[in-house]
Amino acid sequence: MSTEANKALIRRHFAEIWNEYQLHVADELVSPSYHSHFPLPGQPPGIAGFKFAVQALRTSFPDLSITVHDLIAEDDKVAARLTARGTHQGSFRGIAPTGRGVEWSGIRIFHIADGKIVEHWANWDDLGLLQQLSAR
């Protein structure tokens, strides 16, 4: 695939799977052998693990929205600079729902092969997110 096609795949990944919560689209865009280098506790391997992560975050933040600010592609990799926003309405990392609106930023790098996401790396501002969720 071209770098533009790879970027389009990642745009669709965020728009349809994460923002519109159309989890079935993962079957089209994510490889069965998908590997996360940033797994959640208890996340299984493969596409089941990808779906697990989406469901877990959407349970904690049902109105989750991810804004893609930049996509940079080279060969079979796409890097994305992102901002996530949501309302904490379900338990997250042992923190009971607070009802607070939160926002955190991150960078993700995707490896694409045969038109599907096969692995990804992530770096999110977890400290900033946890500070927003904790009592002040």
Locations of the language-model features?
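C-terminal and inter-domain tail/linker signature
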Residues: 1-136
